[in-house]
Curated annotation (Swiss-Prot):
This is S-adenosylmethionine:tRNA ribosyltransferase-isomerase. The lineage of its organism: Bacteria, Bacillati, Bacillota, Clostridia, Natranaerobiales. The gene is queA. Pathway: tRNA modification; tRNA-queuosine biosynthesis. Its EC number is 2.4.99.17. PANTHER family: S-ADENOSYLMETHIONINE:TRNA RIBOSYLTRANSFERASE-ISOMERASE (PTHR30307:SF0).
C-alpha cells in the first residue's frame, strides 16, 4: 500500500497543545464498523457503551522524565540526553544524545550538582549511545528531580502539570511517551465501567520514542518498526482468555495494548502471559485475533498508528471519520479527543 493513502490535511489549530482541565470532558467519537455509523459524544459517557462482561485492558506504564541536560565532566561542554530504555546491565541504558560529537566512549557527563553521572560505554549501529549511570539513592527519584518530560515534537507549549501526561493508573516506570488513549480516564469512569458489568485488567508496554518516527518508505510494507518492551501478567492473560471463551468483548485501551495483545496471541485466539520485545507492524490486511474493540486518540498523518486503526476498522471508514472530526473541530494527537471503535 502507498504511504500517501494515509495522508490527510489537518489545520494546525486542531493540534491540542494542552490537556483539558477535566480529563473526561474530552470528546468521544464512536465509530461502528458494521454500520459505518459515526456518533459524537463525550468521554464521560463511555460507560453507556459498556456491555456486561466487557474486559477493558489498560497499559499501566508510567512516563519517566527522560530528558536530561548536563555538561561534559572534562570540558563543561553542554549535552542533551534522552533515555530510551534500560539494558541488561545494572544502571545501563540506551540513550540519544545531542550533539553527538561530544559523546564518545569513555566520556563522562554530569547532571545537577554532581547528583548523576553518565559514562558513555559505546555507540550503537543506529547512532544512539549505551551509557552507565552513577548516582546515590534511588534512580527514579534522581530522574524525577533532574529530568524533564520529553513531550512530542508537535506540542510547543510547556506542560504546567507533568501528572497530566500520565494516566491515573500509571505505575510501571519506563515510557518516554504517554499511552495517550488512557489519559481520558478518571477513577470515576473506571468505577462506572465496573458498575455496568465491565472488568479492567492491566498490562505494561513501555512506549519508545520510535512511536514518533515518521514512515519514510513510499510503500508502507517496507517500513521497519521500532521494538518496545511489554509484560503481560498471568492474571491479565487469564481474564482475557476467560472473556474470549465466554464470547465477551476484549476492549484495548490504546494502540500499545493492541500491539501487545496481538503479539502474545495463540493460534486459537487466546493469549499467553509473558514479557519481551515487540516490533509488530499492523496495517490493512492484518487479521485481528484478540482485540474486539478499541479506544484510541486521533493520530498523525502517515503514521503507523493511523495504519493500525485503519487495519481494524477499514481505511475508508477511518479516513472519512477523520474528515468528520476535522469538520466538527475535534482536538487531535496526544492531548486531543478520543475515538471508540466497535463492531
Amino acid at each position: 500500500m502507498k504511504l500517501e493513502e494515509f495522508n490527510y490535511e489537518l489545520p494546525e489549530e486542531l493540534i491540542a497543545q494542552k490537556p483539558l482541565a477535566n480529563r473526561s470532558k474530552s470528546r468521544l467519537m464512536v465509530v461502528s464498523i458494521n454500520s459505518s455509523d459515526v456518533q459524537h459524544n463525550h468521554f464521560e459517557k463511555l460507560p453507556q457503551y459498556v456491555k456486561d462482561g466487557d474486559l477493558f485492558v489498560i497499559n499501566n506504564s508510567r512516563v519517566i522524565p527522560a530528558r536530561l541536560f548536563g555538561n561534559k565532566k572534562q570540558t563543561g561542554g553542554k549535552l542533551e540526553m534522552v533515555l530510551l530504555h534500560p539494558l541488561e546491565g545494572k544502571d545501563e541504558w540506551e540513550v540519544l544524545v545531542k550533539p553527538g560529537k561530544r559523546a564518545k566512549p569513555g566520556n563522562v557527563f554530569e547532571f545537577g550538582q554532581e547528583t548523576l553521572e553518565a559514562e558513555i560505554l559505546d555507540i550503537t549501529p543506529e547512532g544512539s549511545r549505551r551509557v552507565k549511570f552513577y548516582y546515590q539513592g534511588n534512580f527514579q527519584q534522581v530522574l524525577d528531580q533532574l529530568g524533564q518530560m520529553p513531550l512530542p515534537p508537535y506540542i510547543k507549549e510547556e506542560l504546567e502539570d507533568p501528572e497530566r501526561y500520565q494516566t491515573v493508573y500509571a505505575k510501571e516506570s519506563g515510557s518516554v511517551a504517554a499511552p495517550t488513549a488512557g489519559l481520558h480516564f478518571t477513577p470515576e469512569i473506571i468505577s462506572d465501567i465496573k458498575d455496568q458489568g465491565g472488568e479492567v485488567a492491566e498490562l505494561t508496554l513501555h512506549v519508545g520514542l520510535g512511536t514518533f518516527r515518521p514512515v519514510e518508505t513510499p510503500n508502507i510494507e517496507e517500513h521497519e518498526m521500532h521494538a518496545e518492551y511489554y509484560q503481560l501478567p498471568e492474571e491479565t492473560a487469564k481474564k482475557i482468555n476467560q472473556a474470549k471463551q465466554r464470547g465477551n468483548r476484549v476492549i484495548a485501551v490504546g494502540t500499545t495494548v493492541v500491539r501487545t495483545l496481538e503479539t502474545v496471541k495463540t493460534d486459537d485466539g487466546l493469549v499467553q502471559p509473558g514479557k519481551g520485545w515487540t516490533d509488530i507492524f499492523i496495517y490493512p490486511g492484518y487479521e485481528f485475533k484478540v482485540v474486539d474493540a478499541m479506544l484510541t486518540n486521533f493520530h498523525l498523518p502517515k503514521s503507523t498508528l493511523l495504519m493500525l486503526v485503519s487495519a481494524f476498522a477499514g481505511k475508508d471508514l477511518i479516513m472519512s471519520a477523520y474528515q468528520a472530526a476535522i469538520e466538527e473541530r475535534y482536538r487531535f494527537f496526544s492531548f486531543g479527543d478520543a475515538m471508540f471503535i466497535k463492531n
